[in-house]
Amino acid sequence: MATRIAPSADVSQDAALGEGTSIWHLAQVRERAVLGRDCIVGRGAYIGEGVVMGDNCKVQNYALVYEPARLADGVFIGPAVTLTNDHFPRAVNPDGTLKSASDWEPVGVTIDEGASIGARAVCVAPVHVGAWATVAAGAVVTKDVPAHALVAGVPARRIGWVGRAGEPLVPAEAGPDGAPRWRCPVSGTLYQEAGSESDTTIREVTH
């Protein structure tokens, strides 16, 4: 399937778009951006210079994905989401002169496979969002998000776990070692917690 670019979209000739990718009205895709197959970039969205996106990503209307963000396969970026690239932003240098590209080094947000960022959430670079995690609408992410975590609030904190289907996991019988377990209500997949209270992760288990 060929790529589709709306007449009002601004796509650099130096950008690379995978087969089947669609760029909708008023969206901008900057120089050296690389988008995989079957991606969708919604109306008014911005994809920064050199941003890399995997296959089957969705960037919804008016989202801002600043360079050098890295999005793996199947990432969802909700409407009006912002992925920042400057941890200490200033318009001017200490001497009052206007900052140029040579006066600062951009840092990017990294989002792993299948993760979702809800509408109007902000991810403050250089955070890393783990695979299949969900960031709730309006959250401000200032710390790394573990895989399968559900985070919400300002600043974002983990309030639960989610499975690949995106729905919150429900409590299940504890594992043989007493570790908390969770089950996906859609697929039935079982997960078990590991790590310390301040650094908890989750992984799939077979029994």
What are the functions of these language-model segments?
Residues 163, 184-187:
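Short cysteine-rich clusters marking metal-coordination/redox-active sites
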